[in-house]
From Swiss-Prot:
The lineage of its organism: Eukaryota, Fungi, Dikarya, Ascomycota, Pezizomycotina. Gene3D superfamilies: FAD/NAD(P)-binding domain. Its EC number is 1.-.-.-. This is FAD-dependent monooxygenase ptmM. FAD binds at residues 35, 49, 108, 308, 321. It holds the Pfam family FAD_binding_3. Pathway: Secondary metabolite biosynthesis. Its cofactor is FAD. GO terms for molecular function: FAD binding; monooxygenase activity. It is a single-pass membrane protein. It is an enzyme of class 1 (oxidoreductase). It comes from Penicillium ochrochloron.
Amino acid sequence: MNKDKFHVIIVGGSIAGLTLAHCLHRAGISHVVLEKASEPAPQIGASVGILPNGARVLDQLQLYETIEKYIEPLETATIGYPDGFSFSSSYPKLVNERFGFPIAFLDRQKLLEILYQHYPDKSKIRLAARVISIESSAIDSEVTTEDGTIYKGHLIVGADGVHSRVRSEMWKAAQRIKPGLVTKREQRSMTVEYSCIFGISAPIKGLIVGEQVNAFFDHLTIVTIHGKNGRVYWFLIQKLDRKYIYPECPRFTAKEIGPIASDLKEVKFFKDITFGQLWDSRETASMTVLEENVFDTWYHGRMVLMGDSVHKMTPNIGQGANMAIEDAAVLSSLLSDLLQKQTQPPTNAQIERLLAQYREVRYPRVNSIYKTSRFLVRFQARDGIFNTLFGRYYAPHAGDLPADMASKTIAGGELISWMAYM
């Protein structure tokens, strides 16, 4: 069938949604993006790591060349401990040599700006379009936004983040058909044990461009990445007082961040450089809890999830955005392949088989990387006697272990199957 007769509604215009829009545009598949924010690239103080597996897909989409202008490849990482011991690792450089792309960070806002500005038809990206309900029938679905506009499509993609409206609507639809299809256990499977203050700071003397600092304290981790022109991207991760079940977890206002940060200003994370210097030179900063989970239910009917809406990791592993980019590559590849074979719009059964295949391809890889993420956040926060001793007395003498761990998550990354890759 004509691919432009099959219409995809993407809910969420962040990295996941905009990457999928680029993929669908290249495939000639009709689509629209509904983004609740009134601007395409808001500054929320966040950075984003582009690892080789995500970079390869962005390179296929001819976006990576632009991204390269705003990144500084990492070459060295320094790891420090509370007793003053530290060691350096060239694992970022080794990863670059192995995969042909570096580990690099840039402003999340800048990546969104690139994705938006390089998308050829801005009329397909609807801003200030907050979704309030989704209804599905045997042949299509309807999405209603806050202003009363109704969008009709054949597939609804939830690229709307950890607080996904599409996930909620999908669960409600599943419960109407068969109560218990999405179990209470799954609905309460996302947990929170850590908080994160994250920000971007002006250059600080002593923090060298192209280097990363990881400072491991008891139940506290400080990570800094020194990017283009010395711009410092940083995370301060702390263990909370207890384990919370989402959505019943702490929320932090802008007024609360200052006092929390002030209590940590004297903490030295690299030589004599303190967290206070990071904080005082900040351009922007925010605070959030770190949700963790991979949901079992990825799709129902004509609704499907991708990115943080279905798998949420901590930033320690740097794979969150890259997993969303891979999701876009796989989903668009499967859709393109199906529609090329069709003379009529796909039936519900065909859509269900496609979405089952999408989950079958993605779940094992995502779950494996998620487990590594869970380990890393606890390892770096010296959470428990094993992590404390392993981190201090084994890891510094383990040679290429950091590079091997990073390489394991990067290897096997997905590509857009119908696009050439050199």
